[in-house]
Each structure stands twice: as structure tokens, then as C-alpha cells.
């Protein structure tokens, strides 16, 4: 899924 920490800086996904 999409797990955004703050903005679109650090996101844990399979991108």
C-alpha cells in the first residue's frame, strides 16, 4: 500500500 511519512519525500511503496 501507500505509506507516506510526511509529504512525497519518503514513501514506503513498490515504486
Swiss-Prot record:
Reactions accelerated catalytically: 2 a phenolic donor + H2O2 = 2 a phenolic radical donor + 2 H2O
Note accompanying the cofactor annotation: Binds 2 calcium ions per subunit.
Function of the protein: Removal of H(2)O(2), oxidation of toxic reductants, biosynthesis and degradation of lignin, suberization, auxin catabolism, response to environmental stresses such as wounding, pathogen attack and oxidative stress. These functions might be dependent on each isozyme/isoform in each plant tissue.
Top-level taxonomic group: Eukaryota
Protein name, as recorded: Peroxidase 9
Enzyme Commission no: 1.11.1.7
Entry annotated with the keyword Ribosomal protein: no
Keyword line: Calcium, Heme, Hydrogen peroxide, Iron, Metal-binding, Oxidoreductase, Peroxidase
Leading EC class: oxidoreductase
Cofactor entry: Ca(2+); heme b
Family the entry assigns: Belongs to the peroxidase family. Classical plant (class III) peroxidase subfamily.
GO biological process: hydrogen peroxide catabolic process
A molecular function (GO) term: lactoperoxidase activity
Amino acid at each position: 500500500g501507500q505509506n507516506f511519512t510526511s509529504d512525497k519525500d519518503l514513501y514506503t511503496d513498490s515504486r
